[in-house]
Amino acid sequence: MSQEYTEDKEVTLKKLSNGRRLLEAVLIVVTILAAYLMVALVSFNPSDPSWSQTAWHEPIHNLGGSIGAWMADTLFSTFGVLAYAIPPIMVIFCWTAFRQRDASEYLDYFALSLRLIGTLALILTSCGLAALNIDDLYYFASGGVIGSLFSNAMLPWFNGVGATLTLLCIWVVGLTLFTGWSWLVIAEKIGAAVLGSLTFITNRSRREERYDDEDSYHDDDHADGRDITGQEKGVVSNKGVVSNNAVVGAGVAASSALAHGDDDVLFSAPSVTDSIVEHGSVVATGTETTDTKATDTNDEYDPLLSPLRATDYSVQDATSSPIADVAVEPVLNHDAAAIYGTTPVMTNTATPPLYSFELPEESLPIQTHAAPTERPEPKLGAWDMSPTPVSHSPFDFSAIQRPVGQLESRQPGSNQSGSHQIHSAQSSHISVGNTPYMNPGLDAQIDGLSTTSLTNKPVLASGTVAAATAAAAFMPAFTATSDSSSQIKQGIGPELPRPNPVRIPTRRELASFGIKLPSQRMAEQELRERDGDETQNPQMAASSYGTEITSDEDAALQQAILRKAFADQQSERYALSTLAEQSSITERSPAAEMPTTPSQVSDLEDEQALQEAELRQAFAAQQQHRYGATGDTDNAVDNIRSVDTSTAFTFSPIADLVDDSPREPLFTLSPYVDETDVDEPVQLEGKEESLLQDYPEQVPTYQPPVQQAHLGQSAPTQPSHTQSTYGQSTYGQSTYGQSTPAPVSQPVVTSASAISTSVTPTSIASLNTAPVSAAPVAPSPQPPAFSQPTAAMDSLIHPFLMRNDQPLQKPTTPLPTLDLLSSPPAEEEPVDMFALEQTARLVEARLGDYRVKAEVVGISPGPVITRFELDLAPGVKASRISNLSRDLARSLSAIAVRVVEVIPGKPYVGLELPNKHRQTVYLREVLDCAKFRENPSPLAIVLGKDIAGQPVVADLAKMPHLLVAGTTGSGKSVGVNAMILSILYKATPDDVRFIMIDPKMLELSVYEGIPHLLTGVVTDMKDAANALRWCVGEMERRYKLMSALGVRNLAGYNERVAQAEAMGRPIPDPFWKPSDSMDISPPMLVKLPYIVVMVDEFADLMMTVGKKVEELIARLAQKARAAGIHLVLATQRPSVDVITGLIKANIPTRIAFTVSSKIDSRTILDQGGAESLLGMGDMLYMAPNSSIPVRVHGAFVRDQEVHAVVNDWKARGRPQYIDSILSGGEEGEGGGLGLDSDEELDPLFDQAVNFVLEKRRASISGVQRQFRIGYNRAARIIEQMEAQQIVSTPGHNGNREVLAPPPHE
């Protein structure tokens, strides 16, 4: 038994391909890995070292070792209990991949994407279901991390049951997407398994009987299969016979097909051959020679290069019958098989047959010789050199056309043999036209259509005769061209029979003479109606064509005579010369104006007649006005162009479209009129229609006819009161056609829209009626509404360069409202504490990298930065972290990191990091805080918000002076504007006054005109020195008044004055002198406002004026606080030569924006930190009596807000300037640089002046060495020289120039 099995099943080793080897190797490795994972999962022990267990001091219990413990722990952590299912799934996938070794299916990416989606859904939902419904395994979640995530996300939305149902639904969908199984099939399989198991348990199966039944069923099926296979093979063989028979003939193919399926539609469809046989078109007998030649020739042709087979060109001699005797050429079908006398029969009989043109038997002609046998492939080379006729479509009708030479040499009575005629017709070209138009002037006895001259001739094949008959029925006898081109333009007009050759005029020429011709469409319709009669009796049809069209010609000639009479009447009536008419006729383009339908011809002729009549009227009026009598019109009727009949049969379609007659030059109207040609009128040429159509629509609709002179002659002008439409719509009145000649400098066409407007026949007629005036076109004056004043045209003043001094509406509120400022966003961005916690851990890690042990104990988020409070380990210095600021910024990927070594009230070190999303601090929200509203000081200013988001409000009266420094773009100017607006929102002009010094003329100039100013914004540095000198004098005056009243500051002074006014006894000025003014009584003391001196660019002021300003500022900084004068100095360059030690010592309050280096930061703050700011309003504010700067984020103010507040204050009142501020008067101590006016000169002054004038150098050290005096005395002498204009002020380098001339001069 085994021997027989071994012999039947020979075991052979089959080599695998390279890809199959690699696949099986991978599958083996994956299977082993699955087994290893299963062992590791089953033997998992929580005490083994793993991803979640770092400390380990015991032996490994897992059978897979440490690697197995790690992998099992990772799988349990990720998937939970479902980790046990991963190894079996891997084995199942390997087995599936192994079984599909021979499957080479097309990779469906859509199905693959669905499987991936199903896999993802199964994994996620399975983990979620396990997490919801299974207890935890060891210390892992039952669903792993994935299940815990899904369960925690779904439980707030659904309860436990709802989440379970939702996940089950998604699991079911995922299973369908992954496996592609329908749940109906799954249910059936489950039911079958259940029933099968129950049947097996109850032992009710009948396996023996069922197996016997199945064997009998299989035997029957095999028997039926053999029969069915035999039948199918028979059908196939029969189909092969059908295909072969179809090559030989269509009749045998039809019989073979009907033998197996009489009711099959595909086999019962009639073929082309059947259609021809049914209509009487049979294949002729006696053509065996031709058939033999065709068969032999076609054997050499490759059937792969053509859809036709070689046997398709054989003649079917089974169906032949005699046919009529008219010899013509055949018509080609799509396969070009009709030329060779056959009808192609396709191999597939289900293909519908092509259209065939059947004619009755009595109209079928006979050809004298057989058709030539050729290849059906397309012809190469010159198409006009081919000796065979060419056809384009089975729907086209072929017509034989004899050469012109034969037509002209033939006599009407001559008769040639039929074979010669057919041979000549074959050697010529066939003109194939889409419209079979019969020549009405052709005689029926011409041999081309004779049916009696070709009798008793041999017959042709059936397909050739059928096609030839269809062509002979509509064949014209001669061509309209004298060359050999096949593109013949037929059916254009009636070709009348004449005894001698004449040139037949075109339809356009006849229409110009008034002869209305029947259109080509009407002729085609008549031909279609007579199609049936024509095919039955061609000879009668030809005669009937001649008779009917002759009657149409009579009607056309009669209508032409009427039109000629009407034209003569019009010519005699208006005395128009025929020369203009002939020129108008010859100049018209026949291609553009050729009518296609009778309605179009009629409309066009009526329009032309109307235009010609109007032109005749205008021309007659001109001639009558010029000569006083009508011209000679005797020859107007007879001078009509005669028709040349010398070339009757030599015209072509190109000759109809091209007119070689001499033309007159086309007159074009120039858009500009030269001054030399102003008096020359315009002469109408023969092309009035094209000229007037090209003329723009500015021409008036109608004017009375005026005389028209020839070029070169001056014509008298007539005044025209008619206004043009263009002139009325544009300028209000028109000067077109006026009698006053003037040179024209503007073109006639003034706009493109005037040319592109639509032209209707009415407008064309109206344009034709309007003659062109001989007077030049003068430019129309513009109306005053569109003109501008001459002063505005000539002036260079621009609205943007003018101050808006218009009176504004006075506000009703005592102070500006906050509505003038931009509102902050309603919703604030929440603080992400989770991200801040992660950043805190990252900070600790980065500090640990630099061996600095610290712990983040507090986080203070702000609008721009966040402060992390670090608790350093014992023994760690804060300077170590300060030195690591740049390294921390790099490791934390931050722009800058600032270390705060001391936080007031806390034992921690601050680390300030910028936020990822920076917020904007709006001025309105800071001004709207309670801290600013409740501050009673009129000099309260807002700076912004601190790192905790709390508003920072300062009092300028307590500072008492402020020094601001920052580079370009740091927000320094915005901060200064915020300070000024804060004071404008807090104080009135009676409380605070400003002196603004703006060397750049940009930042503070916007405040020009507010009532708070004591003087205009100072932009000249000399005026700035005078303003500061006035401040010093005002300070001294206020100190005298306060000392007289016994008060300590300006607030006490104003209170004392207010009390006196309340008592009704105002205080007189104790220092008034009668010589000070013309008043009899001394003035009363009034309330004194605070004075704030704003200097925007202090460095430029120091460079321009020098030491003098430094001394003045130093004096103001030392003494001006009690007098109510406060300085705000802003600079971009906080260097030591600008902010000297004298100024820094007297200005304790400073604000540092972003600076460029630590040196500048130490210059302004006496410590570092300003170089690491973020810019855009980020500042360090050093409050008075404090050495620790506070980080503040400045309030943002837009220019629109500044202008709004300034305009609000401008509407409340005008400023009251004090002229003596900039005049440099000697009031108080401000006269001579702080010197008293009655101070005596130094005894050495004259000698020092002589010394300076001789040496031409003025220096304090030189005077000191020369006269051996102290530095202070020498400096005072030099200052006295400067006061008397002997020497100049010191320059930026401290040198002075000697202004007085030398002594010898």
UniProtKB/Swiss-Prot annotation:
Keywords: ATP-binding, Cell cycle, Cell division, Cell inner membrane, Cell membrane, Chromosome partition, DNA-binding, Membrane, Nucleotide-binding, Transmembrane, Transmembrane helix. Gene3D superfamilies: 3.30.980.40, P-loop containing nucleotide triphosphate hydrolases, Winged helix-like DNA-binding domain superfamily/Winged helix DNA-binding domain. Its main location: membrane. ATP binds at residues 969-974. It is a multi-pass membrane protein. The chain crosses the membrane at residues 22-42, 75-95, 110-130, 138-158, 167-187. Residues 523-533 have a biased composition (Basic and acidic residues). Residues 535-549, 707-743 have a biased composition (Polar residues). InterPro entries: FtsK/SpoIIIE/SftA, FtsK_4TM, FtsK_alpha, FtsK_dom, Ftsk_gamma, P-loop_NTPase, WH-like_DNA-bd_sf, WH_DNA-bd_sf. One of its GO terms (biological process) is chromosome segregation. Residues 949-1162 form the FtsK domain. Coiled coil: none annotated. Residues 188-1305 are cytoplasmic. Residues 405-434, 484-503, 518-550, 578-602, 707-745, 1286-1305 are annotated as: Disordered. One of its GO terms (molecular function) is DNA binding. Residues 416-431 have a biased composition (Low complexity). Belongs to the FtsK/SpoIIIE/SftA family. Essential cell division protein that coordinates cell division and chromosome segregation. The N-terminus is involved in assembly of the cell-division machinery. The C-terminus functions as a DNA motor that moves dsDNA in an ATP-dependent manner towards the dif recombination site, which is located within the replication terminus region. Translocation stops specifically at Xer-dif sites, where FtsK interacts with the Xer recombinase, allowing activation of chromosome unlinking by recombination. FtsK orienting polar sequences (KOPS) guide the direction of DNA translocation. Homohexamer. Forms a ring that surrounds DNA. This is DNA translocase FtsK.
